[in-house]
Amino acid sequence: MKVRSLLFSTLCMLAISVTFTSCSDDDDAPWNDEGTKVELPQRRMFILNEGKADNNNAGIAFYAPNRDANDSNNNFIANIYFKQNEKQLGDTGQDILEYEDNIYVIVSGSSLLLKLNAAAVEEARLSFSSSDGQPRYMAAKDGKIYVTLWSGKVARIDSRTMKIEAYVDVNANPEQIVENEGKLYVA
């Protein structure tokens, strides 16, 4: 009888230990916040504001979805790019993309592709020539950023070096670009 009781107790303890085993939801690797002037939580959202054309007033807003509105730290910063970099983003914010723990931003009116860290601190910028036309939208895959250019091209850019590697001619005035199963689709 004692063997049965011992076996039953062992099985109950095993069941209880399995029941209380769980995974932590805070195992995400920390973001690269190097150079930040603002303390930011792990969960964050960036919102690209286009601004008014020809006015150099595009911006990036920051929102902390899990932070209490009464928290002493801001859960919303209207223009985090300006706060972090002490300069305006540029003319006509067009597209924003998170890729490989960085944020890439197309500023169409200023003909720029910006690479920001996860705290919106600028790390690199690529200026497009007037013959390229203004950049519009982007997609990313395998360490490359693909940018549609108003001149009728798609530029392939190395995401780490921010150097243009190649161009592909497409129809005039391409807009959206999407990567799916190793193929790019341009509209």
Question: Where do the language-model regions lie?
Answer:
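Solenoidal tandem-repeat scaffolds enriched in leucines and small polar residues
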Residues: 158, 164-187
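An edge-strand/N-cap motif at the start of beta-rich repeat modules
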Residues: 34-67
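Bacterial Sec-dependent N-terminal signal peptides
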Residues: 2-6, 13-45
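Short loop/turn segments that connect beta-strands within beta-propeller blades
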Residues: 66-68, 117-121, 158-162
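A short beta-strand motif characteristic of beta-propeller blades
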Residues: 71-88, 120-129, 163-168
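Repeated scaffold domains used in trafficking and secretory/extracellular systems
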Residues: 32-37, 88-98, 132-142, 172-181
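Structural motif
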Residues: 54-62, 111-115, 153-155
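Conserved beta-strand positions in repeat-built beta-propeller and related beta-rich domains
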Residues: 45-55, 98, 105-109, 147-151, ...
